[in-house]
């Protein structure tokens, strides 16, 4: 058989998979690239808990998600048990207009979906990024929406917000 298309890079969402499986995907990818074998089999992988990822973008949801380049004047990103931030931004960093607008990934893990939602609600509520527009408040609204909390989501959920 043949591959019509193949994406050989790690996906943005890989921290979710890593947290619920306990597998360091980047480490395994490097091992494979260097000719080594995987350190586990499919049967070794057990799913544990629930993880949620929010991509924090420099964009304005109220203006059609228009990109928001500029300089970050102040910021605070949450931390703690079950919270992961993947980012390279800092206060004084300038977001250029030329690239993808994602400036951070906020990932949470908990024992179950309800706890993970509560953790994400809290974490998003703590995020401070000033000087640029972000989609943090928009995502906060999503994870606090009753339909999201109850899992009553379909392809028209975002349009109903």
Each language-model region and where it sits:
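ATP-dependent carboxylate activation and anion-phosphoryl transfer catalytic cores
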Residues: 1-161
């Amino acid at each position: 058989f043949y591959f019509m298309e193949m994406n050989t890079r790690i996906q943005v969402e890989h921290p979710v998979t890593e947290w619920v499986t306990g597998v360091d995907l980047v480490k395994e990818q490097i091992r494979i690239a260097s000719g080594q074998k995987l350190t586990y089999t499919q049967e070794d992988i057990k799913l544990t808990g629930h993880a949620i990822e929010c991509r924090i973008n420099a964009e304005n949801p109220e203006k059609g998600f228009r990109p928001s380049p500029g300089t970050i004047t102040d910021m605070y990103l949450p931390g703690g048990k079950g919270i992961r931030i993947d980012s390279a931004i800092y206060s004084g960093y300038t977001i250029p207009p030329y690239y993808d607008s994602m400036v951070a990934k906020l990932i949470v893990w908990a024992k179950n979906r309800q706890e993970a939602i509560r953790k994400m609600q809290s974490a998003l509520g703590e995020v401070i990024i000033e000087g640029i527009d972000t989609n943090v408040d928009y995502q906060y609204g999503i994870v606090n929406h009753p339909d999201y909390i109850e899992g009553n989501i379909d392809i028209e959920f975002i349009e109903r917000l």
